[in-house]
Amino acid sequence: MSGRVGDLSPKQAETLAKFRENVQDVLPALPNPDDYFLLRWLRARNFDLQKSEAMLRKYMEFRKTMDIDHILDWQPPEVIQKYMPGGLCGYDRDGCPVWYDIIGPLDPKGLLFSVTKQDLLKTKMRDCERILHECDLQTERLGRKIETIVMIFDCEGLGLKHFWKPLVEVYQEFFGLLEENYPETLKFMLIVKATKLFPVGYNLMKPFLSEDTRRKIVVLGNSWKEGLLKLISPEELPAHFGGTLTDPDGNPKCLTKINYGGEIPKSMYVRDQVKTQYEHSVQISRGSSHQVEYEILFPGCVLRWQFSSDGADIGFGVFLKTKMGERQKAGEMTEVLTSQRYNAHMVPEDGSLTCTEAGVYVLRFDNTYSFVHAKKVSFTVEVLLPDEGMQKYDEELTPI
């Protein structure tokens, strides 16, 4: 049995009754304490009564902490309202609301230099409540329960800038909050125009997604417009995505409903860096260099780094070894990222690189040009792996 209203086994029905009895003290504070709502928490924990109750009570604490009862009255900062991509537009063929996330135009540094992480998370929670409110309105309009949504992730333009660690951590926290506090609300997550980097991004988020959510993620290949039209009627799908829906002025992107973001003007920044904790620290003698090696087993991995120096600038470049088992000088290796000097003592430096071939990559901090000063360098380096399960879509993924 599916565990939904009208499709419960005797055991599931008994568990639902017991669950309602156990949480009767919080029922008045719930947004809608009907069987549909309670069954979401039971399904999320496989009808384990104790785990479902713990999850629901934790959700009540979350509602209080985030002031969810009044979050729709809250207005996000101007930067978010103008430049945070996404929006609610149309319904699928079953009447479920459709939410669009537009990844490419997202300006990671602009956002986090202009607003706080809490502002971003609160905005995402506000979006969740907007969507649930739309589900309630659809239920009234159609005369039948609408409790799930379709999410469309437009990955056109997904690039290395989106793997900036502070942004990734915000999205990881968001997906964690989504799983814990909005269970069983996702019908499908449709990925369109996925680039070659999508499997890497998916692998970063996967630990924060439940097995059930992962099963609902569908990567649409080259025929993504046809795929969307199977689920969404043309008149409910923006023309930009293959349908016939437009704004009143004929705009195919439906800008009155979907925000497409953009680069945030530096005049709106309130800080010039995000505080970073580094994993390693090394003292580099004057006239010397320091090399860090990372073995990349297959193409498509992403090297991501952050570093800062104390007191003065530092050189940095990335190389690929040509001989294994021995330390090579810069001139003996293949230069992958040209070595140059960075003012990392003034502003922390960060970057990333898609590894196009397997081998041992060397991140080289260069102080050979300094005959007077030693340099202390703090750094963090990560290897981001593509998800193996996504490799089957590789032929249809768009090159970045």
From Swiss-Prot:
Listed A to Z, the keywords are: Lipid-binding, Phosphoprotein, Transport
- Any one GO MF annotation of this record: lipid binding
Any one of the GO CC terms: cytoplasm
Domain CRAL-TRIO: residue ranges: 76-249
Q: Which InterPro entries match?
A: CRAL-TRIO_dom, CRAL-TRIO_dom_sf, CRAL/TRIO_N_dom, CRAL/TRIO_N_dom_sf, GOLD_dom, GOLD_dom_sf, SEC14/CRAL-TRIO_domain
Q: Which residues form the GOLD domain?
A: 275-383
Phosphoserine: residues carrying this PTM: 223
Q: Which Pfam families match?
A: CRAL_TRIO (PF00650), CRAL_TRIO_N (PF03765)
Post-translational modification remark:
The N-terminus seems to be blocked.
Which domain of life, per UniProt?
Eukaryota
- Which tissues does the record link to its expression? Detected in a layer of supportive cells in olfactory epithelium, in the apical region of the trachea and in the surface layer of ciliated bronchial epithelium in the lung.
- Function of this protein? Probable hydrophobic ligand-binding protein; may play a role in the transport of hydrophobic ligands like tocopherol, squalene and phospholipids.
Name of the protein in its database record: SEC14-like protein 3
Upper lineage is: Eukaryota, Metazoa, Chordata, Craniata, Vertebrata
Q: Which gene encodes it?
A: Sec14l3
